[in-house]
């Protein structure tokens, strides 16, 4: 309720001045906000993800072919602790369905599935949940750069797939679909934008439907323009910020 009221209060009443600058990462960046007025300077910039591409800060986490799963810690996400929301999925069922899918992929492609662990996930519990598979924390960038393809639900890690022109497979489960919330909506958005068919692990659709592990150059380029980089400058993010706001 407080957030609802605060958003609708005039800035002058709250003694808050409009923003001097807003940095936008793509043509679809949302710049509708009470803090943005006709006095605010809109500065095109790329996302911080693109800085990683510029700096070349990529260490090969492993030296052989593999498939990357981007973990989002859905059964025990730390955000649930401070909210009244129930877990999106049940732990036992979720990891059972995931590991069955991973077993299938490892058999089909003859390479291991490794896990890009959610940064706030428990590493010890993850080892158990993923049946001893290789797990890497804070290595999502490097893992996707060198991967055969990536498995995601609705993660921002899709940015890395686009940057490195790597295919990705969208997955869901019956429990995720039953939620009908912003997370399921995010999956649908990615499905529509990239024309990717979402694989439902609960119904084991991967056993009968061929997985698409290629990518559409046009949709990747469009995503880059819309959400990552809207100009031709290759100046690093913080250099642009410093140059813009210097007094």
Predicted regions and their residues:
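A short helix->loop->beta-strand "cap" motif at the edges of active sites that frequently abuts
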Residues: 19, 39-40, 110-111, 165-167
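Catalytic binding pocket for nucleotide-activated donors in carbohydrate/polymer assembly enzymes
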Residues: 127-130, 156-232
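A nucleotide-sugar donor-handling region in carbohydrate enzymes
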Residues: 2-84, 219, 244-247
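Short, charged/polar "capping" segments at the starts of alpha-helices
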Residues: 29-34, 53, 77, 120-127, ...
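C-terminal alpha-helical cap of glycosyltransferases
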Residues: 228-247
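Donor nucleotide-activated moiety binding/catalytic core segment of transferases
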Residues: 47-49, 54-55, 96-99, 112-164, ...
């Amino acid at each position: 309720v407080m957030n609802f009221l605060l958003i609708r209060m005039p800035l002058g009443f709250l003694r808050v001045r409009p923003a001097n600058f807003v940095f936008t990462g793509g043509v679809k960046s949302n710049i509708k906000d009470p803090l943005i007025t006709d006095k605010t300077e809109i500065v095109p910039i790329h996302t911080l993800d693109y800085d990683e591409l510029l700096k070349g800060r990529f260490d090969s986490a492993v030296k052989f072919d593999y498939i990357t799963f981007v973990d989002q810690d859905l059964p025990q996400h730390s955000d649930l602790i401070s909210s009244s929301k129930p877990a999106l999925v049940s732990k036992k069922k979720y990891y059972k369905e995931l590991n069955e899918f991973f077993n299938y992929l490892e058999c089909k492609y003859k390479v291991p599935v490794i896990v890009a662990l959610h940064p706030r996930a428990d590493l010890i519990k993850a080892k158990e949940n993923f049946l001893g598979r290789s797990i890497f924390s804070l290595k999502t960038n490097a893992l996707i750069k060198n991967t055969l393809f990536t498995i995601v639900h609705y993660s921002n890690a899709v940015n890395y797939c686009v940057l490195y022109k790597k295919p990705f497979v969208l997955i869901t489960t019956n429990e995720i679909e039953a939620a009908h919330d912003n997370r399921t909506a995010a999956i649908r958005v990615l499905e529509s934008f990239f024309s990717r068919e979402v694989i439902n692990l609960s119904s084991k659709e991967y056993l009968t439907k061929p997985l698409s592990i290629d990518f559409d150059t046009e949709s990747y380029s469009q995503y880059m323009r819309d959400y990552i980089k809207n100009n031709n400058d290759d100046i690093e993010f913080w250099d642009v910020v410093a140059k813009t706001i210097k007094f």
